[in-house]
């Protein structure tokens, strides 16, 4: 993948960069693996905004992705590499030997025509999925399960990869992309390799309208609001906040820790660097 730049023929064109999509081999998704995706506009079932700055954006179809990779021992041929509007990574369409079709997250280096397989006896090759106990120490992995048979939850974004650092007892020690060191059960599965579309982090949005295409609305600073709308609001002209910075709901902002305590915290060996 490469990044494409444009001549500055207009202010909106000047800073825009896009992917050249050279790895994409098919433009229409597999019909049997898509379903409708209704936009929520950031609202919950009561109709209240639970996520701000959401709304609009281009229509999308949801591609059903196989995060479990539980079809053991049956080889699958990579039929195509496709764009997925619902994630930063590319997806790969697999044609299994028994006729079934599934989408997976496309790892870096996976090409049309290659064969991938899941299961404890799979080779250590990009795109193959194995339990952590069968993966050599030092291997780069992605799409990692938090619990056995729970489906991949960790390390699924474009260009992301974790590393298997050690195995001890029933746990494997994983270094996450953030630098956090975490223990996971060795029965959990992971896919070999790094997630593809590595250059995604270097793309510049370039203009406000492109954010709107993605369904992201403007973010307004609290200090320019009225007092009824935000704790930072009000005052004559440009005025200071007048208190320690807080969220719209009055909780400490800018540096205050917000992570809740969870039972899984005991499996974190080393926190990420702040």
Swiss-Prot record:
Region entry Disordered, spans: 224-274
Top-level taxonomic group: Bacteria
InterPro entries: NA-bd_OB-fold (IPR012340), Rib_uL2_dom2 (IPR014722), Ribosomal_uL2 (IPR002171), Ribosomal_uL2_bac/org-type (IPR005880), Ribosomal_uL2_C (IPR022669), Ribosomal_uL2_CS (IPR022671), Ribosomal_uL2_dom3 (IPR014726), Ribosomal_uL2_RNA-bd_dom (IPR022666)
UniProt keyword Transcription regulation present: no
Keywords in alphabetical order: Ribonucleoprotein, Ribosomal protein, RNA-binding, rRNA-binding
GO MF term set: rRNA binding; structural constituent of ribosome; transferase activity
GO cellular component: large ribosomal subunit
Residue ranges, compositional bias (Basic residues): 257-274
GO BP field: cytoplasmic translation
Pfam families reported for this sequence: Ribosomal_L2 (PF00181), Ribosomal_L2_C (PF03947)
Subunit description: Part of the 50S ribosomal subunit. Forms a bridge to the 30S subunit in the 70S ribosome.
Function: One of the primary rRNA binding proteins. Required for association of the 30S and 50S subunits to form the 70S ribosome, for tRNA binding and peptide bond formation. It has been suggested to have peptidyltransferase activity; this is somewhat controversial. Makes several contacts with the 16S rRNA in the 70S ribosome.
Family assignment from sequence similarity: Belongs to the universal ribosomal protein uL2 family.
Entry protein name: Large ribosomal subunit protein uL2
Organism, scientific name: Pelotomaculum thermopropionicum (strain DSM 13744 / JCM 10971 / SI)
Lineage, uppermost ranks: Bacteria, Bacillati, Bacillota, Clostridia, Eubacteriales
């Amino acid at each position: 993948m490469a990044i494409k730049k444009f001549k500055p023929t207009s202010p909106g064109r000047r800073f825009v960069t896009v992917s050249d999509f050279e790895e994409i081999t098919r433009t229409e998704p597999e019909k049997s693996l898509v379903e409708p995706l209704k936009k929520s506009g950031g609202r919950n079932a009561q109709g209240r905004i639970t996520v701000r700055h959401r709304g609009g954006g281009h229509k999308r179809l949801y591609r059903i992705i196989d995060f479990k990779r539980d079809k053991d021992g049956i080889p699958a041929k990579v039929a195509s590499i496709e764009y997925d509007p619902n994630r930063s990574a590319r997806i790969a369409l697999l044609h299994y030997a028994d006729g079934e079709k599934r989408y997976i997250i496309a790892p870096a280096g996976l090409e049309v025509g290659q064969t991938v397989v899941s299961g404890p006896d799979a080779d250590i090759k990009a795109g193959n999925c194995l339990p952590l106990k069968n993966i050599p120490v030092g291997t780069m992995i992605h799409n990692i399960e938090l619990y056995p048979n729970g489906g991949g939850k960790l390390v699924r974004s474009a260009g992301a990869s974790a590393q298997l650092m050690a195995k001890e007892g029933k746990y494997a020690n994983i270094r996450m992309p953030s630098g956090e060191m975490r223990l996971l059960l060795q029965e959990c599965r992971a896919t070999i390799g790094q997630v593809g579309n590595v250059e995604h982090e270097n793309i510049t949005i370039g203009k406000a309208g492109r954010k709107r295409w993605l369904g992201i609305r403007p973010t307004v600073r609290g200090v320019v609001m009225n007092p009824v709308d935000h704790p930072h609001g009000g005052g004559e002209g440009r005025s200071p906040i007048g208190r320690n910075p807080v969220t719209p709901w009055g909780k400490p902002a800018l540096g205050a820790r917000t992570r809740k305590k969870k039972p899984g915290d005991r499996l974190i060996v080393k926190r990420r660097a702040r």
